[in-house]
């Protein structure tokens, strides 16, 4: 099925609308033709009209089967500069908080084919991380705090709100045209995919630091004999963790992305070289773990030059400690020819920083065009669950929280991006390795493929179903 999307809106919001349409409809099997000229709309039975309240199409009797989305002047004014969104300006549809609701009740009453909120403006707000430009608060690492966001205030951080908006749109399309939008298959021939990754933030720690780590985490230590034996064993051989994790993944037939820092202490050169040799030429992926201050200090170019000898196929990156601001991050990684970023997560909780479960591009509000770097937002990080700065859960709660979040996320389709640090396994080593294997096995039993960020980048790069006509 082909769906025409007619844009009858001012040029001041046209680039934002095209960007949003391309990203929110890319996960579907249907073809979409986007145009600002009526004569290019060949399919009059399946047409979405995005227009102003004054548009002549809105009152044309020949457009009875069209679905209308209204762009209001107040929305154009909102996006003309950076400011917080007014949370009094909400409507709820099936308990879903919809921003940019239509305020003209007369139009709503007179047209049953009208979406009661502006899904284009609402989706643009989340996908572009628009709110982060107006948030002045920063934590000690210079990051936007989750508590300052609309996701926190509306309690929707664990809900992909853009997916919910698209579900509402899909219901309207089904009622109007008697058809359902179908999602594309992800790699693995399912509607969901798990992107698994590990950060190597340090190769090893001293015995003194290891003991301190254990003492500081006594709150979460599972006191049993097998964990005690593991703790004693890893007192002298903590680097065995890498092999243990690799063995589990190889046994289960899953693959992961390994994010390597730009450099490690010279004494670990042989170990790092052996790791690279293990993963190169396999279905695993090596990617770049930019240092924590690389974005803030504008050092990406220098760091990229330093890793060229590691693996010529490196195409993605993630920032250490998720320390960045949106525009500076994507400007620098685009300038240095990375293909994807895997940093977009608020570390305080699991969830959806951009409100969407599919990989997408980020809009640059300064240059008014999308960045060329694909965002594969991160959804789960082990540190979020076990670090005392964040949720600080005991292991039995960690597993339950993870499984509940994963189960809910798979209902939406798309990509679930999971980061497990190797250091996670330094505490409760035996039981955490077993937990890790149980979680991976559970995902496999659901028919979900577990693989790399690079595989998702390749999938998205080939997903071309939006045609723009002038």
Whereabouts are the PLM-identified features?
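Conserved hydrophobic/aromatic pocket- or pore-lining residues that grip, position, or stack substrates
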Residues: 199, 289, 333
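Catalytic domains of cell-wall/extracellular-matrix polysaccharide-remodeling enzymes
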Residues: 17, 25, 294-372, 418, ...
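Metal-dependent polysaccharide deacetylase catalytic core of the NodB/CE4 family, i.e.
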Residues: 202-206, 219-229, 242-328, 344, ...
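Short, well-ordered alpha-helix to beta-strand connector turns
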Residues: 45-46, 283, 338
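Terminal accessory/targeting
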Residues: 1-270, 354, 358, 365-470
């Amino acid at each position: 099925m082909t769906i025409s999307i007619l844009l009858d809106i001012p040029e001041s919001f046209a680039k934002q609308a095209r960007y949003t349409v391309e990203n929110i409809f890319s996960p579907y099997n249907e073809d979409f033709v986007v145009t600002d000229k009526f004569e290019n709309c060949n399919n009059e039975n399946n047409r979405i009209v995005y227009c102003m309240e004054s548009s002549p199409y809105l009152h044309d009797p020949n457009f009875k089967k069209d679905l209308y989305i209204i762009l209001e002047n107040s929305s154009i004014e909102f996006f003309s500069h950076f400011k917080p969104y007014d949370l009094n300006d909400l409507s709820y549809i099936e308990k879903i908080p919809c921003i940019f609701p239509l305020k003209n009740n007369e139009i709503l009453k007179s047209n049953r084919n009208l979406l009661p909120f502006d899904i284009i403006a609402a989706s643009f707000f989340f996908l572009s991380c628009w709110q982060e430009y107006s948030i002045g608060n920063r934590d000690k690492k210079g990051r936007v705090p989750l508590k300052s966001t609309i996701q926190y205030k509306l309690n929707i951080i664990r809900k992909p709100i853009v997916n919910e908006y698209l579900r509402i749109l899909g219901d309207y399309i089904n009622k109007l045209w008697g058809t359902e939008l179908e999602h594309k298959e992800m790699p693995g021939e399912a509607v969901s995919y798990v992107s698994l990754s590990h950060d190597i933030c340090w190769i090893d720690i001293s015995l003194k630091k290891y003991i301190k780590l254990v003492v500081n985490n006594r709150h979460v230590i599972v006191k049993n004999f097998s964990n005690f034996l593991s703790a004693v064993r890893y007192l002298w051989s903590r680097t065995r963790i890498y092999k243990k994790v690799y063995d589990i993944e190889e046994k289960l037939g899953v693959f992961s992305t390994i994010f390597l820092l730009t450099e490690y202490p010279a004494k670990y050169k042989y170990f790092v070289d052996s790791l690279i040799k293990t993963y190169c030429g396999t279905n695993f992926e090596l990617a770049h773990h930019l240092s924590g201050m690389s974005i803030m200090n504008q050092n990406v170019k220098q760091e990229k030059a330093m890793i060229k000898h590691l693996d010529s196929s490196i195409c993605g990156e993630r920032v250490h400690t998720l320390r960045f601001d949106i525009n500076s991050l994507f400007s620098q990684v685009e300038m240095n020819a990375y293909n994807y970023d895997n940093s977009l997560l608020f570390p305080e909780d699991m969830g959806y920083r951009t409100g969407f479960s599919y990989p997408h591009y980020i809009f640059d509000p300064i240059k008014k065009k999308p960045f060329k770097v694909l965002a594969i937002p991160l959804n789960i990080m082990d540190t979020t669950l076990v670090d005392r700065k964040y949720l600080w859960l005991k292991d039995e709660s960690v597993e339950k929280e993870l499984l509940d979040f994963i189960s809910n996320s798979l209902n939406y389709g798309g990509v679930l991006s999971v980061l497990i640090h190797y250091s996670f396994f330094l505490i409760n080593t035996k039981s955490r390795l077993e937990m890790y294997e149980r979680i991976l096995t559970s995902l496999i039993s659901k028919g979900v493929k577990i693989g790399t960020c690079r595989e998702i980048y390749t999938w998205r790069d080939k997903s071309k179903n939006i045609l723009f006509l002038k």
